[in-house]
């Protein structure tokens, strides 16, 4: 069934039913009245600009936890549902290449532009937006509302790539009755933070601020990319970049992809007892992860722009596909996407308070981890990809490493990734 689908119950009923996840605060309600609901998308080509595979189509779904959600869909609505959540800086569009194969296996597959991204509207576009709108659990509420709006009570598999794994993981933790399987891509599942046990706080370790201070002492001074993306400077940099938006995405995809020279023969980062030692260990990573302190991300990417020959011969990320990201982010801006970093890193209060409600919970649905073999992101995990699944899961089904893929395996090697996902669905 195409077109929009009316939710089975009102927004008031939905919010009451979702009270176990925490109600909206008064501040959230006030901010909701001030959100920007219009964007210059009517001036753009159709979503995907004629690069979508046959059978993958865009659709708008209204009344989704205050949002109108733009999404891609494939397969017949009414079949078992697979929900694909993108990461940063991506869109639902990033799943286009795996959707047909999953749909052909008998599923209805949807990939939304998440809150803050793309053509999904209804969120506050200001830098000082209410942080509670971007907490992990409110973004889980977005997904529960979308599932309901589509006429479903269960999701056969929820998949999260990069930042999307945070939403997907918590969806599986708080609603295992609804989200029956979990796959995370390029990032291990998020486990709820721990509370002190037995009246004694856990000692040792260091804070993000202490690590950042040690990065600043390196020669040349460095900073963690997450600390950068959480800053107002990043928001301003992305509004005034020296290159075109398409050129930024070309360089960003290249540097984090499987062909980039610095992404070969990776060894996982070693856990270190002090911030000073950790800063030195992290400095092994390329500058797109541990950045020079005097450069923003656009300036960093200028130095990594691939050659014209590479661009002309790049089959997994054509110029037409690159231009889709360029045009969509030019229209939407970056502020909403950056809120996902900002409110996790500089406004921990509401987010951590909600997450601590689930301290001690494990992921109790069948779970799979997929990562590119040439992805530094997967090697930032203590112990690397091989360590995923040792704690926090009760039904971990394994890790699948994808060769000749970096941080974008669903776009770099879609046939392999879709086969892994379908195999997981059919075997559990």
Q: Language-model segments: which ranges?
A:
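A short loop-to-beta-strand scaffold at the N-terminal edge of the catalytic core in hydrolase folds
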Residues: 65-73
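Flexible "cap/lid" subdomain of the alpha/beta-hydrolase fold that forms the substrate-access gate
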Residues: 39-58, 69, 117, 121-159, ...
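Catalytic histidine-centered segment of alpha/beta-hydrolase-like enzymes
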Residues: 405-413
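Twin-arginine (Tat) signal peptide motif
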Residues: 6-15, 115
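N-terminal secretory signal peptides
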Residues: 1-9, 20
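Short glycine-rich catalytic loops that host catalytic nucleophiles or stabilize transition states
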Residues: 399-405
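Conserved HGGG/HGGXW glycine-rich cap/lid loop of the alpha/beta-hydrolase fold
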Residues: 72-123, 161
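Boundary at the C-terminal end of the N-terminal hydrophobic targeting segment
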Residues: 29-33
